[in-house]
UniProtKB/Swiss-Prot annotation:
Name the UniProt record assigns to this protein: UPF0102 protein BAD_0596
One example GO MF annotation: nucleic acid binding
PANTHER family the record matches: UPF0102 PROTEIN YRAN
UniProt organism field: Bifidobacterium adolescentis (strain ATCC 15703 / DSM 20083 / NCTC 11814 / E194a)
UniProt cross-references to CDD domains, sorted A to Z: PoNe_Nuclease
Amino acid sequence: MNHSSSHDVPAPTQPPEQILDSLARRLHDGTLRSRQIGELGEQYAAAWLESQGWRTLDRNWHCRYGELDVVSRNPMGQIVFVEVKTRRTMRYGTPQEAVTASKQINLRHAAVQWLTAPEHRMPNSGVRFDVVTVVVQGDRPLLHHIEGAF
């Protein structure tokens, strides 16, 4: 089984506020393609979670069931699998509407794969699935954190 993360998760070298400000400016670049917007949205969501006391354990982890955008440990010790959806407009519905029932099933399967990998075995106080939406409008991205989304 091929499990991979496309990003290492280094410790931040800047205060979270500076990271969020920098990412917010980059998200408002009108020349970005949708894939780039999505990647920056994931970075923005992870930085925001870290600013709330969360610890990023993994990002963009792949297995046969798909990709886990962000895997974090929240301050209560739960392992939280965070699906991030970033949009410029609501033309095609809200970002959270893109997390369909079939997507949720695949995310659950991917989470089991992540949890059972020997390198990820760790004590925890439970597992949860959250959705973070990032809407790039106005002067600052609008982030919405849906805890226990499914």
